[in-house]
Amino acid sequence: ELLDFEVTQDSDGSGIAEKLNTGMPTGIRVLDCYEAKRPIRELDSLRADVTLEYDAGVPEGAAERLRELLARDTLVIQKRTKRKELADVDIAPMIRKADVTADDYNVFIDITVQAQNPGLNPQLIEKAIAAYLPELTPDFVRVRRRAILDVNGQDFR
């Protein structure tokens, strides 16, 4: 995630991440803090690691079926709007890239999604799985955001 804020003193960002981390909830931490050089409108996509955990082991053929699901031309899920209503949203055009691998108990998805106008929360991949491949619904999902990218796939800074 990207947190855009202003400070009341001159700073290059050093030391701010450590100070912010002292007040963050468990599981959330600030990785870096730096001066904004570019406008937010140049932010294009988000890269995340999505881990699907299966207590009884990954179902046979799950990685291939999930790879096919994420490559579909249309992938409609129900998503809450800002008004808290449910709306059908096609997330397929918002998925830029998805690499799927697996071991015995986990499926790993290295995914790049559209970040804004509209943006896709990578956590919603779980909803797509539940809607289209309910037999592959994992016991637990972990999402770790890795990078925020510009239109050229470079780190947004």
Language-model-derived ranges and their functions:
Residues 72-157:
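Core RNA-modification/binding signature centered on pseudouridine synthases
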Residues 8-12, 23, 53-57, 103, ...:
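Generic structural motif
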Residues 4-6, 49-53, 99, 110-114:
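Residue-level recognition of well-ordered beta-strand positions that form the cores
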Residues 13, 36-38, 58, 106-108, ...:
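Residues in flexible loops and secondary-structure boundaries
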Residues 1-51:
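Ordered, amphipathic secondary-structure segments that act as subunit-interaction surfaces
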Residues 49-87:
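A contiguous pocket-lining binding segment that forms or flanks enzyme active sites
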Residues 41-43, 59, 118:
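Short capping loops/turns at secondary-structure boundaries
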Residues 13-24, 61-71, 124-129:
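Short amphipathic alpha-helices in soluble, non-transmembrane regions
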